[in-house]
């Protein structure tokens, strides 16, 4: 699991920082490279669909115990990528890059900061019992559209 963000920064520079800014996603040239040729964590094949679509940037695999263990997945990655086949990387950017940028205020001057993620805010207004899974489909289809809207506009990640 990729559960840490490691900052390579001096203590002095950290004290001057006012925000932590990062992007959930990968640059185009890295996203479509064979994971077996990449260093960890990008070599995790469970987070890679194929060369055409690239890596998953966020993966939620859920089940609902009260609904006959219905499985539901949300896999955020680039979508509508055009290439000769699924085994070929595209030559141009995908129609939907689906990279999500974060800017978190640095209010604590501590080298051991923890982030809290609210899955309920990511899934807000999505009926998991009725909605189809969202796995690299068109981001304009429901529930993909609502999930991406939640990632971009709802406070689902914050300092703990």
Which stretches of residues belong to each language-model region?
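A short, solvent-exposed, low-complexity linear motif enriched for acidic/polar residues
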Residues: 1-160
């Amino acid at each position: 699991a990729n559960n840490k963000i490691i900052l390579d920064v001096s203590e002095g520079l950290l004290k001057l920082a006012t925000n932590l800014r990062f992007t959930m996603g990968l640059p185009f040239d890295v996203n479509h490279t064979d994971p077996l040729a990449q260093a960890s964590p990008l070599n995790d094949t469970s987070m890679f669909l194929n060369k055409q679509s690239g890596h998953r940037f966020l993966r939620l695999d859920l089940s609902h115990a009260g609904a006959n263990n219905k499985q539901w997945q949300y896999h955020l990655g680039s979508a509508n990528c055009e290439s000769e086949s699924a085994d070929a990387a595209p030559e141009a950017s995908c129609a939907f890059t689906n990279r999500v940028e974060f800017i978190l205020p640095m209010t604590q001057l501590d080298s051991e900061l923890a982030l809290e993620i609210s899955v309920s805010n990511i899934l807000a207004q999505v009926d998991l019992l009725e909605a189809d899974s969202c796995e690299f489909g068109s981001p304009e289809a429901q529930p993909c559209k609502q999930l991406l809207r939640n990632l971009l506009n709802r406070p689902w990640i914050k300092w703990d």
